[in-house]
Amino acid sequence: MEPLTGRMMQMPLMISSLLLHAARHAADTEIVSKRVEGDVHRYTYRDAELRARKAAQAFARLGCAAGDRVATLAWNGYRHLEIYYGASGSQLVCHTINPRLFPEQIAWIANDAEDRVL
């Protein structure tokens, strides 16, 4: 007897799937964010997904492997979004570090987490 698969997903459920879904089904929808520099940045889900894939490739070139930890030290904006999705798409563990912390605190957090990349 064959197992019934019903409508079960045939792919792993990953955070990066959210951005891929948006790029496929709402490719031209704009993502709008205000940059630290003060201006407004606009691009599409298609562009964001492409840049997240490039971030994933950069992590691979840096020697990151599935399960490695990477830290972001960034303000909340489009660049942070790309790093977040690029890391999760590479099966990396991504955590944020508050840029307002003192350098000693940032170093302690990154060392304690055993980050591969900051």
For each feature predicted by the language model, list its residue ranges.
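A detector for short, charged/polar N-terminal pre-domain segments
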Residues: 2-9
